[in-house]
Design a protein with these regions (language model features):
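A structural motif at transmembrane helix-loop-helix junctions in multipass membrane proteins
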Residues: 20, 134-171
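Short alpha-helical transmembrane interface motifs in multi-pass membrane proteins
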Residues: 21, 54, 62-67, 97-98, ...
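Hydrophobic alpha-helical transmembrane segments of multi-pass membrane transport proteins
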Residues: 49-87, 91-114
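Hydrophobic alpha-helical transmembrane segments of multi-pass membrane transport/permease proteins
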Residues: 15-42, 52-68, 160-172, 213-224
Length: 242
């Protein structure tokens, strides 16, 4: 299984880097970061504070990670590539985990490089920042896997990706100006990252409520993914039987 998984990971990595549209989606967060930095410099506004990261990191993850995952899964389902892989002996676990691993690799690139582009005061070695943003990236990845599995065609995938991107990108920003949005964020998968942005010097131990909320979200998303996989396995079995 290890060799098969390693081969799938390599194939996924090649797909991310060879497909021009997917590669552009991955690179676009860094382009946006440079653009915003230039735009703010014209207005003599600093991009070094953590508040700016509070918008740009979720936005970058939704554009650079969420959209490619949904696009890949929806395209493979439309072309019945998933069924072909299952019939050839590839397990659902291997299929999804390979996509998740490659996606999280690029997510970590976003988490590390974006603060460097912005000359942010937030150090990439800051445990609170790295921990909270990584947990958010895992949640975004799982949500995207679920959305991609539910999309039977590329058109449906594009439609589903819009609310996923909108919620991930703009909810943290709206939380700063609207109490209802703030309450939603406090109980969402963005909760821990949002708390860090609000209080960068606060230890994670004092954010135990947000940590528990994020862990519950991850557990819920993994459970939903598992249930969808079980349904697909049943459908594939019925297809073979007939």
């Amino acid at each position: 299984m290890t060799k098969k998984l390693a081969a799938l990971i390599w194939l996924r990595f090649k797909l991310f880097t060879v497909n021009k549209s997917i590669l552009f989606e991955i690179v676009s967060p860094f382009i946006f970061a440079y653009f915003y930095k230039y735009l703010y410099s014209l207005q003599k506004i600093s991009t070094q504070n953590s508040d700016f990261l509070g918008f740009l990191i979720p936005f970058s993850l939704s554009i650079g990670i969420s959209i490619p995952i949904i696009a890949i899964l929806s395209e493979e389902q439309e072309k019945n590539s998933l069924s072909a892989l299952m019939l050839s002996g590839v397990h659902y676990f291997e299929y999804l985990i390979s996509l998740a691993i490659v996606s999280l690799f690029f997510a970590l690139c976003i988490i590390i490089i974006i603060p460097l582009i912005l000359n942010s005061k937030v150090s990439i070695l800051n445990f609170n920042y790295f921990f909270s943003s990584t947990f958010m990236a895992i949640s975004v990845c799982l949500i995207s896997l679920i959305a991609g599995l539910l999309a039977k065609t590329q058109v449906i995938g594009q439609v589903i990706s819009l609310p996923v991107v909108a919620i991930t990108s703009f909810l943290p920003m709206l939380a700063t100006i609207n109490n209802t949005c703030k309450a939603i964020v406090n109980y969402s998968f963005i909760s821990l990252f949002y708390k860090y942005i609000q209080e960068p010097n606060l230890a994670l131990g004092n954010n135990s409520k947000s940590l528990v909320i994020v862990l519950l979200w991850i557990a819920l998303l993994i459970t939903i993914t598992y249930l969808i996989i079980q349904i697909y396995r049943k459908d594939l079995f019925n297809y073979d039987w007939h």
